[in-house]
Amino acid sequence: MTLPRFDQIRPKIEQHIREVKDFPKKGINFRDIMPLFTNPQLVNELCVVIADHVRHTVGHVDSVAGLEARGFLFGPQVAIQLGVPFVPIRKKGKLPGATIEASYVKEYGEDRVEIQEGAIKNGDIVFLIDDLLATGGTLRAATDLVVKAGGKVGEAFVLIELAPLNGRSKLPDVNLTTLISYDSA
């Protein structure tokens, strides 16, 4: 069986993304991926396609790391498809035990993300996954976190990229794949 490629699954995914104007505040057009989860077969198909993409473009990966919270919706299933561990990247203070952390700048200050110490081993190749790339701060911090833990980002994948916010510019050293890119934020 030939697995569908990104260009074949993209229109199906786009049909399940809802634009919500002025959310969470006026002037923001929120891209809501939650309607996608009303179709479990499509979510499964997407995760199979992502895993197939990883096998053919990155090759070997040691783990899949997903960013809190919506990276957790796809990351574990992609990791299962690849037969590798899933590493949750969480906001500071959400993981027990010793952690490694990295910071990033938000609109009104600094925030931190972390992983549990030992979740990524020295030399591990990691596939990063999240739902959205906007300004790039969170994905930059996640990349820095993987490197700080001794790993290397084999590729980063986002479901949606808001191109006008130029988040890609913060990731010049990252092989980044986007399923859907919007020309308006």
UniProtKB/Swiss-Prot annotation:
Catalyzed reaction equations: AMP + diphosphate = 5-phospho-alpha-D-ribose 1-diphosphate + adenine
Statement: the UniProt record of this protein carries the keyword Acyltransferase: no
Principal subcellular localisation of the protein: cytoplasm
EC number(s) on file: 2.4.2.7
Pathway involvement of the protein, from the record: Purine metabolism; AMP biosynthesis via salvage pathway; AMP from adenine: step 1/1
An individual GO BP term: AMP salvage
Pfam families hit by this protein: Pribosyltran
Superkingdom, natural source: Eukaryota
CDD domains per the UniProt record, alphabetical: PRTases_typeI
Keywords (A to Z) from UniProt: Cytoplasm, Glycosyltransferase, Purine salvage, Transferase
GO cellular component entries: cytoplasm
Tagged with keyword Iron: no
Compartments reported by the entry: Cytoplasm
First-level EC class: transferase
GO molecular function, one term: AMP binding
Function statement: Catalyzes a salvage reaction resulting in the formation of AMP, that is energically less costly than de novo synthesis.
Protein family according to the UniProt entry: Belongs to the purine/pyrimidine phosphoribosyltransferase family.
HAMAP family linked to this entry: Aden_phosphoribosyltr (MF_00004)
UniProt cross-references to NCBIfam families, sorted A to Z: apt, PRK02304.1-3, PRK02304.1-5
The protein, known as: Adenine phosphoribosyltransferase
Native species: Caenorhabditis elegans
